[in-house]
Structure formats: structure tokens, C-alpha cells
């Protein structure tokens, strides 16, 4: 059994009030919560800094925790929740992003099961990259891993660098590229330790929070997602695209 916590910060720079954005008659955060509830989680909690988000979640039959508005990351918000609820150190927590209303419930369960079956402090997922444009896109985070399935590095750069191929052309790629999906599973005790660590230099260079874990010598298990998630919502254009998808479901 595992618990899903959905961080939902209200003051998005590019899309203010994003958690409450209407998607086919329901707030986005409720759409995400409904997916999480179908994952097999024993409990689903929305962690937010906004009273209106709390009210929307509760009105939809969900559970919400009002958190400090000054957190620097979603992981810090998770830490506040696990301490408020006094979760045991062994409890598996899955961090589902609050702006992914199309996240497949299958992969929420998958990442929790992957963590339960490995020795890493943290687990996440990836999907194969087939398109050269995506491989060279710094907004698509790439990951390389060892033969046991543990992350060696995450980067916005194109890794691994196909030296022989890219000398000739960058219009095609091989089968060596994986895009990281922003879903994480951890044990509650690991989150408590994580937030005590100082940010790492690599994390600050790449602006990738997960690099702190590797910097401090911990392992991250990377599984290949059973199903690729749909687009997340970062901009008004993303929101329009998501609304169109829901009208067709």
C-alpha cells in the first residue's frame, strides 16, 4: 500500500491559479486527484498553499492539507505533509504533479511497486525518446542509468552523446535516449533526510532537484513507464490543448 501526495502551488508564474483551472467542468487539481485515486493508493492527499484549492478538493470528496506558502520545492511541501500526518519512515509516498490531469493511473502504481522492490531511496520513471528534436530540447530532461536500472545522471543536455552519429548529422538519433518523467516514489524517512541536505552544485546548474540525491550518494531507481503520460499544463496553450483532449474523451 502507498500514499499519493499531490503538491499544488497556487501562484504559478505562467498560469496563475493553475490548480483551479477548469477542465471540462472540474478543477484541474480534482482531475489529477481522481486519477490518483484509481491507482490503488491507500490514501490521496493534495498539499496546497491556498484555501480555495482546499475547498475545491474537499467539495469533490478528497483530502487536502494546507501547507506553508514559502516552500522552495514540491518535495519540501511533501515533507511538511508527512510530518503533519506523522507517517512512519517506511511509508511509501508517491509524488504526483498537480498539473498532469492526463497522468495514467498505471504508472502511479508502477513507480510505487518499483520502489518497494528495490534498495534505492527513491524511484522514478522514463520513456524512450524517438524524435531528434526532443533529444536536443533542454526542457526534455534526459536520464542515463546503469545495467541494474539505477540513475547515473539526469541532464537537460543530450545524453548520452552519440559521437559517431552527431559528427555527421543531428537530424536522427539512435535508441539510447530516455526522457525522465516527473513522478517520484520515496519512503517517508528518505524525504525527511532529503530536505536536511543543502542544495548541490549540479542541481543548481541544471535546475534539476533530483540531482541532489545523486550528489549525496543515494540511488534512484529508473523504470521504463508502462504508459507515457499526456502533456502537462504549464502555459495557457497547454491548458487549451488539455481542454480539447477532455472534450474528446
UniProtKB/Swiss-Prot annotation:
Keywords: Cytoplasm, Lipopolysaccharide biosynthesis, Nucleotidyltransferase, Transferase. It is found in: Cytoplasm. GO terms for biological process: CMP-keto-3-deoxy-D-manno-octulosonic acid biosynthetic process; lipopolysaccharide biosynthetic process. InterPro entries: Cytidylyl_trans, KdsB, Nucleotide-diphossugar_trans. It catalyses: 3-deoxy-alpha-D-manno-oct-2-ulosonate + CTP = CMP-3-deoxy-beta-D-manno-octulosonate + diphosphate. Transmembrane segments: none annotated. Its EC number is 2.7.7.38. Pathway: Nucleotide-sugar biosynthesis; CMP-3-deoxy-D-manno-octulosonate biosynthesis; CMP-3-deoxy-D-manno-octulosonate from 3-deoxy-D-manno-octulosonate and CTP: step 1/1; Bacterial outer membrane biogenesis; lipopolysaccharide biosynthesis. One of its GO terms (molecular function) is 3-deoxy-manno-octulosonate cytidylyltransferase activity. NCBIfam families: kdsB, PRK05450.1-3, PRK05450.1-5, PRK13368.1. HAMAP family: KdsB. This is 3-deoxy-manno-octulosonate cytidylyltransferase. It comes from Photorhabdus laumondii subsp. laumondii (strain DSM 15139 / CIP 105565 / TT01) (Photorhabdus luminescens subsp. laumondii).
Amino acid at each position: 500500500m502507498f500514499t499519493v501526495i499531490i503538491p499544488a502551488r497556487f501562484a504559478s508564474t505562467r498560469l496563475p491559479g493553475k490548480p483551479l483551472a477548469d477542465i471540462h467542468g472540474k478543477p484541474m487539481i480534482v482531475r489529477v486527484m481522481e486519477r490518483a485515486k484509481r491507482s490503488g493508493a491507500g490514501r490521496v492527499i493534495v498539499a496546497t498553499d491556498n484555501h480555495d484549492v482546499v475547498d475545491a478538493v474537499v467539495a469533490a470528496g478528497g483530502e487536502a492539507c494546507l501547507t506553508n506558502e514559502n516552500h522552495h520545492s514540491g518535495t519540501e511541501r511533501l515533507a511538511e505533509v508527512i510530518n503533519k500526518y506523522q507517517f512512519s519512515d517506511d511509508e511509501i509516498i508517491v509524488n504526483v504533479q498537480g498539473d498532469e490531469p492526463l497522468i495514467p493511473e498505471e504508472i502511479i502504481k508502477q513507480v510505487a511497486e518499483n520502489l518497494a522492490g528495490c534498495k534505492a531511496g527513491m524511484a522514478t520513471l522514463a520513456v524512450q525518446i524517438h524524435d531528434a528534436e526532443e533529444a536536443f530540447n533542454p526542457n526534455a530532461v534526459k536520464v542515463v542509468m546503469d545495467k541494474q536500472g539505477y540513475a547515473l545522471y539526469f541532464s537537460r543536455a543530450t545524453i548520452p552523446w552519440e559521437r559517431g552519429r552527431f559528427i555527421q548529422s543531428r537530424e536522427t538519433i539512435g535508441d539510447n535516449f530516455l526522457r525522465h518523467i516527473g513522478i517520484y516514489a520515496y519512503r517517508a524517512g528518505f524525504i525527511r533526510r532529503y530536505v536536511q541536505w543543502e542544495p548541490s552544485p549540479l542541481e543548481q546548474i541544471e535546475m534539476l532537484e533530483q540531482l541532489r540525491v545523486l550528489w549525496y550518494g543515494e540511488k534512484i531507481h529508473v523504470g521504463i513507464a508502462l504508459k507515457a503520460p499526456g502533456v502537462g499544463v504549464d502555459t495557457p496553450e497547454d491548458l487549451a490543448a488539455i481542454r480539447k483532449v477532455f472534450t474528446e474523451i
